[in-house]
């Protein structure tokens, strides 16, 4: 495993990927741009190094964990409003929370932009499940929560959890046991989608096949 955390520690950050990140390209001038306020990251753009911030509950601890995907139109991440604050609130309910700083889809840093965020989300779910025993989390009580474009990523994970988008070595499933989608983007179809999110993830000239594949409201099979 690529991280070690202490039970009940709060706001421990670890890498999603150790070594080479799949589907990545070197881009010397592509740097993360963070907006910091009162010592905390309010938002960040141009993410190319995905991380997870672990917020572990200390009181009335349940057996539940949630991976949080902040929104931002696939161009930036609202880390404070749709990440850290939500994680802290979940902690008051006894729920462990893991805020995912996922990669922004960019042809500068990715070979295939459409699968980049999904790769990070799948890996994050597997990493949390790998730590389930240590953190007293039930393997069947690991969910995902997402806002806006992060809601699209959460719904993509929920409907494409078994799609092989990187070489999987973990024995753990990436399937969320439950999904909480808050004002999510659930379609990439014209007239319905959030155009900025669609353009950022799929490109302005996306094929109809790709649009349909990432219109997750139509991908539900049960």
Report residues per predicted region.
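Catalytic nucleophile-loop/oxyanion-hole region of alpha/beta-hydrolase
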Residues: 78-79, 84-86, 102-139
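Short beta-strand element of the alpha/beta-hydrolase
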Residues: 63-71
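Primarily recognizes the serine-hydrolase "nucleophile elbow" in alpha/beta-hydrolase
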Residues: 123-197, 211-212
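N-terminal cap/lid segment of alpha/beta-hydrolase-fold proteins
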Residues: 10-64, 118, 193
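Mobile cap/lid helix-loop segments that gate and shape the active-site cleft of serine hydrolases
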Residues: 34-39, 184-219
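A fold-wide structural signal in alpha/beta-hydrolase
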Residues: 65, 91-98, 143, 178
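Bacterial Sec-dependent N-terminal signal peptides
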Residues: 1-12
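Short amphipathic alpha-helix adjacent to the substrate-entry channel of hydrolases
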Residues: 56, 79-100
């Amino acid at each position: 495993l690529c991280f070690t955390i202490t039970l009940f520690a709060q706001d421990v950050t670890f890498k999603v990927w150790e070594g080479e990140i799949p589907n990545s390209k070197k881009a010397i001038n592509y740097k993360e741009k963070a907006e910091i306020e009162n010592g905390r990251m309010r938002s960040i753009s141009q993410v190319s190094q995905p991380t997870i911030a672990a917020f572990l509950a200390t009181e009335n601890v349940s057996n539940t964990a949630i991976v949080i995907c902040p929104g931002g139109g696939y161009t930036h991440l609202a880390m404070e409003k749709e990440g850290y604050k939500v994680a802290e609130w979940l902690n008051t309910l006894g729920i462990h929370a893991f805020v995912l700083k996922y990669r922004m889809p960019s042809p500068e840093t990715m070979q295939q932009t459409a699968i980049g965020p999904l790769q990070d989300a799948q890996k994050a779910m597997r990493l949390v499940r790998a730590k389930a025993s240590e953190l007293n989390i039930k393997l069947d009580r690991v969910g995902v929560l997402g806002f806006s474009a992060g809601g699209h990523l959460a719904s993509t994970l929920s409907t494409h959890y078994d799609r092989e988008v990187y070489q999987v070595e973990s024995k753990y499933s990436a399937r969320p046991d439950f999904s909480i989608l808050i004002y999510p983007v659930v379609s990439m179809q014209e007239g319905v989608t959030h155009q900025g999110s669609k353009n950022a993830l799929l490109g302005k000239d996306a094929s109809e096949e790709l649009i349909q594949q990432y219109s997750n409201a139509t991908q539900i099979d049960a």
